[in-house]
Swiss-Prot record:
Keywords: Cytoplasm, Schiff base, Transferase. Involved in the degradation of phospho-AI-2, thereby terminating induction of the lsr operon and closing the AI-2 signaling cycle. Catalyzes the transfer of an acetyl moiety from 3-hydroxy-5-phosphonooxypentane-2,4-dione to CoA to form glycerone phosphate and acetyl-CoA. One of its GO terms (molecular function) is transferase activity. The gene is lsrF. This is 3-hydroxy-5-phosphonooxypentane-2,4-dione thiolase. It is found in: Cytoplasm. It comes from the Bacteria.
Length: 256
């Protein structure tokens, strides 16, 4: 378990920059992910960890990439139906076979299928403990849920109490440090919808400054006009404690 966690978090900084491109498991070929081999592959070398589905790992990611992978382990839903209605979509045997560093599943606190999503986390944690595989719980938000400190404090703590070793959640401007303080395992933030680059870097800096252990971003990287430059700027914030202003200057210089 600790060995795999060390693949995720840089031993010098204790933090991580994950590149998430697992969106296709329920969104299909969304903008920026139509051709992963063309649009996403050039970013692999600039990420600490790749987050994807086993189908993409096997079909698109070259074995020589040599990057740790967090595998999407929940699914069986789509944007055409209720998003929270997920099942476990990956066996632990296959996760081990693919040499992944963790598995990830959504947890939908307060949604119609809350109970099933929590059971999915429990199932993965139990199976993972037998083989030393960490589970990352991803806090999905129902359509009618308010994205605030109280909600994410509840969701992250429940996931940690169920045994998840890492939590992926959203940054909130008010009270994020309370979310981190109330969660006994590392938190990495999701990027969410595409933002202007300067705003994304400010969000990264604020999250790290308030205790996050890293970021797990997708659209704010691969939908950027200059994704490699954006990856380098995010790395500067997470691992080198650069401010958002300095990281944005780096982004501007790298995009030339």
């Amino acid at each position: 378990m600790q060995s795999r966690l060390s693949w995720i978090f840089n031993p010098k900084t204790g933090k991580t920059v994950m590149l998430a491109f697992d969106h296709g498991y329920f969104q299909g070929p969304t903008t920026g992910l139509e051709r992963i081999d063309i649009n996403i592959a050039p970013l692999f070398e600039h990420a600490d960890v790749l987050m994807c589905t086993r189908g993409i790992l096997r079909s698109v990611v070259p074995p020589a990439t040599n990057k740790p992978g967090v595998l999407r382990a929940s699914g069986a839903n789509s944007i055409l139906a209720e998003l929270s209605n997920e099942a476990v979509a990956l066996s632990m045997d296959d996760a081990v076979r693919l040499n992944s560093c963790a598995v990830a599943a959504q947890v939908y606190i307060g949604s119609e299928y809350e109970h099933q999503s929590i059971k999915n986390i429990i199932q993965l944690v139990d199976a993972g403990m037998k083989v030393g595989m960490p589970t990352m719980a991803v806090t999905g938000v129902g359509k009618d849920m308010v994205r605030d400190q109280r909600y994410f404090s509840l969701a992250t703590r429940i996931a940690a109490e169920m045994g998840a070793q890492i939590i992926k959640t959203y940054y909130v401007e008010k009270g994020f440090e309370r979310i981190v303080a109330g969660c006994p395992v590392p938190i990495v933030i999701a990027g969410g919808k595409k933002l202007p680059e300067r705003e994304t870097l400010e969000m990264c800096w604020q999250a790290i400054d308030q205790g996050a252990s890293g970021v797990d971003m997708g659209r704010n990287i691969f939908q950027s006009d200059h994704p490699v430059a954006m990856m380098k700027a995010v790395q500067a914030v997470v691992h080198h404690n650069e401010t958002a202003d300095r990281a944005y200057e780096l982004y501007l210089s790298e995009k030339q």
